[in-house]
Amino acid sequence: MKTGCQWRELSLKEYFSKETISWQLVYYYFSKWSKDGSFRRIWISLLQNNKRKLDLSSVQLDGSHTRSKTGGESVGYQGRKSSNTTNCIFLCDNQGQMLSMGKPISGEHHDLYNIEETLEEIVGLLDAADIEVKGLFLNADSGFDSKKLRDILYKKEIIGNIKENPRNGDTKNEKYFDNELYKRRFKIEKANAWLDSFKALLIRFETLNVTWINLHYLAFSILFLRKIKV
């Protein structure tokens, strides 16, 4: 995770000198535990048992593009980065602790692409961890300003604090917006920077969505364990 080295370059002899363990075996079990949901269950359990250590006075929503060098599932050309990328939507708490994420989407799509499905995935993990979403204040930038998203949040009784996008041209209806609360949105930038400290997540080399997602669950867990000092 930290060095981002290739699977075949794992330093196994230094740690398992008395046993014969190959990088193929390590990857086999990583893939197996990714596909059977083990890393997701670990993350849900950590959240469930340490909810009091989260700051849910507000949550922050944002998308993040990661360059992909090897292609694979949900990879597409992103003009702003002039490269192939994968986009993921993340949710963090008011301290910058990542909470949940949606499935990767191809880089050519904007943050609102399949937003209903993405939000269901994000909220679904919180529900599984017995974290109540009703009444949460959610900050999001103008890229998320859409009637569809606002309606979804309203139905879930989540208070969306979304910066208006002037290009939408919808000035007839006054929308709730708290500028002071919105200043907390920088925490998602902090959270993404912490993820980028893992070189395995800085550039995407995993071709399968399932292994890419579970590398993130592993990173979420490592960062949270450091925070709560278990």
Q: Which residues does each PLM region occupy?
A:
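Short alpha-helical elements
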Residues: M1-V230
